[in-house]
Curated annotation (Swiss-Prot):
Heme binds at residue 294. GO terms for molecular function: catalase activity; heme binding; iron ion binding; peroxidase activity. Keywords: Heme, Iron, Metal-binding, Oxidoreductase, Peroxidase. SMART domains: Catalase. It comes from Mycolicibacterium paratuberculosis (strain ATCC BAA-968 / K-10) (Mycobacterium paratuberculosis). PANTHER family: CATALASE. This is Catalase-related peroxidase.
Length: 313
């Protein structure tokens, strides 16, 4: 547990920001699943011995989403977007990557993130609560430009970058290791909409646009890793890395919508703590807490206890 904060308390705070619905994810409630593949580059195997990084093509399940807990949120509303990828390994197991349009988290701890959500609860005193929070968390003021960037409205799920917030330790076959952060970069040019243009769009235009785009061919993202430098924190997701060493380790190719998963009680969870041989989670407290919140959220919305299927904390 993180500093006395429980997963249920975190979920209550998340739902308190408005729009949450029973039976839906606490965040990123509105999303769509897609099928595709992943093929690693030759550079990947030099960085990690993970089985999906050996250069062979593996199946992938991809989910694009809006960040809100409101499953009916209009796609034209400003907000963080998410892209998650589940790689199926040769032995049938899976490993996950979770990324979003925000480059950094607003806090280095679960408690700090939840305190901000509590300050954002809709109500007459919201402006005062937010002002007080900003005054007592001066680092957040410096992050405001990045937050505005993260909340831009993309013209397509396929025209914006997504970033993993946490560090992972990649271990190569020769035993060498390094910490990395993940970035999913579209091969299409980045494109965003103005607020006025977005207001004229249909409520589900991002899903509709991607469906039309896929009719013309696959959508691709470069999977890049940023390798930590000596001064880059591996445990603070609110701290920007100074390292400019970035390596493309593969390509995610999205071929079409998924029609099999999340039907008839099937549950899909994209958990960044679900790693595999050659990849280890850092000691980032937010990363460690996330898997507990995911398990609690699954139980609340479905009644199912993930139990042994949940990654180790």
């Amino acid at each position: 547990m993180s500093g006395g904060l429980t997963p249920d308390q975190a979920i209550d705070a998340i739902r308190g920001t408005g729009g949450a619905q029973p039976g839906c994810r606490a965040l990123h409630a509105k999303g769509t699943l897609y099928r595709g593949t992943f093929t690693a580059t030759r550079d990947a195997v030099m960085l990690s011995a993970a089985p999906h990084l050996d250069g062979s093509t593996v199946p992938a399940l991809i989910r694009f989403s809006n960040g809100s807990g409101n499953p009916k949120q209009r796609d034209g509303a400003p907000g963080v977007r998410g892209m998650a990828v589940k790689f199926t390994l040769p032995d049938g197991s899976t490993t996950d990557v979770s990324a979003q349009t925000a480059r950094l988290l607003v806090s280095s701890t679960p408690e700090g993130f939840i305190d901000l959500l509590k300050a954002m609860r809709p109500g007459l005193t919201t402006p005062l609560r937010l002002a007080t929070h900003l005054l007592t968390h001066p680092r957040l003021l410096g992050a405001l430009p990045l937050l505005r960037e993260a909340n831009r409205i993309p013209a397509s799920y396929a025209t914006t970058e997504y970033h993993g917030l946490h560090a992972f330790r990649w271990i190569a076959a020769d035993g060498s290791a390094r910490f990395v952060r993940y970035h999913l970069v579209p091969t299409a040019a980045e494109e965003y909409l103005s607020a006025s243009d977005a207001r004229g769009k249909d409520p589900d235009f991002l899903t509709d646009e991607l469906a039309a785009r896929l009719q013309d061919g696959p959508v691709r993202f470069d999977f890049r890793v940023q390798i930590a430098g000596p001064t880059d924190s591996t445990v603070d997701p609110s701290s920007a890395w100074q390292s400019t060493q970035i390596v493309t380790v593969g390509t995610v190719t999205i071929t079409g919508p998924d029609t099999e998963r999340e039907h008839g009680g099937d549950i899909v969870v994209f958990d960044p703590m679900r790693v595999t041989d050659g990849i280890e989670p850092s000691d980032d407290p937010v990363l460690r807490f996330r898997t507990l919140v995911y398990s609690a959220s699954v139980k609340l919305r479905t009644g199912v206890d993930r139990g042994a299927q949940a990654p180790p904390v």
